[in-house]
Regions:
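Conserved active-site motif detector
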Residues: 1-112
Length: 112
């Protein structure tokens, strides 16, 4: 497995991008602080890989910033695990790129 990305050395709060497309706003409205969300990397071979954020149940909510998502996606594809929880959910009058903030944290496979 590749080395842990530097962005995961400590828990990291980051906004989720793309929360206003399709049915994502409805999924966003179901989330609250403390909820666990699912992180899914793009499949291998994608030119600009990223990590997608899904609500419990599987609905897509958005994606990570490319500077975080690209190294994290490669690491996850290679077997790394990362968990995430909702840190903040803003109302519809909050800028879309700041509407959902999650906390990323490395997950030790041996501890699961």
């Amino acid at each position: 497995m590749r080395r842990l990305p530097a962005v995961l050395a400590e828990p990291l709060e980051t906004p989720v991008y793309g929360t206003v497309f399709g049915q994502r706003t409805a999924a966003l409205h179901r989330l609250k602080a403390g909820d666990e969300v699912i992180l899914v990397p793009d499949p291998p071979g994608i030119d600009d890989p990223n990590v997608w954020v899904h609500a419990p149940g599987g609905d897509v909510v958005g994606h990570l910033r490319p500077d975080i998502g690209a190294p994290l996606a490669s690491w996850m594809i290679d077997g790394g695990r990362c968990g995430a929880r909702v840190a903040f959910v803003g109302s519809d009058d909050v800028a879309s790129w700041r509407r959902l903030v999650i906390t990323l944290q490395y997950r030790d496979i041996a501890a699961d």
